[in-house]
């Protein structure tokens, strides 16, 4: 029972995440990863990552859909998530019992109220396929990144060489 419950919870959160992403940019989380992860693009298409802006991109960065969103998309996603969480908090404060199925229905109504298109299915790309694709692109990008990367030590040595050339 616990496994089924946790599986149901994971599916619920994946559904909410995908509907929110779709409302903002017309793609599920997995679809945005597959559409934007590209080893030929600057920073592999990522707009943010754990060690941004000057640190290296690591494998775990590339399978996070939010990392591919621009500032405006990210702001809009955060805004719509915050509005929905505020609504959920208000429902809880009013002691209104809700099942996960109720929350899915309320989410669709909330998105329609906000005049955005509502995702009706699970999307065209699974999370597993998106992760595999992004990690494959990362393996190609890592070679490029390593050739361009300048460590702090390298920067220090280059600065010292420049200073020696000036003096």
What is the predicted role of each segment?
Residues 1-167:
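Positively charged, phosphate-engaging catalytic surfaces used for nucleic-acid and nucleotide handling
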């Amino acid at each position: 029972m616990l496994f089924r419950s946790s599986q149901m919870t994971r599916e619920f959160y994946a559904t909410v995440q995908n509907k929110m992403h779709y409302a903002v940019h017309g793609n599920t989380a997995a679809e945005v990863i597959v559409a934007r992860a590209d080893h030929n693009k600057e920073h592999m298409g990522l707009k943010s990552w754990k060690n941004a802006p000057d640190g290296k991109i690591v494998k775990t960065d590339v399978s996070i859909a939010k990392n591919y969103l621009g500032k405006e998309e990210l702001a809009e996603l955060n805004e719509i998530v915050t509005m929905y969480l505020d609504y959920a908090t208000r429902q809880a404060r009013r002691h209104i019992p809700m099942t996960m199925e109720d929350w899915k229905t309320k989410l669709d109504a909330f998105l329609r109220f906000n005049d955005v298109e509502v995702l009706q299915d699970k999307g065209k790309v699974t999370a597993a396929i998106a992760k595999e694709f992004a990690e494959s692109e990362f393996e190609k990008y890592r070679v490029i990144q390593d050739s361009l990367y300048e460590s702090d030590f390298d920067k220090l040595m280059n600065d010292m060489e420049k200073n020696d050339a000036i003096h």
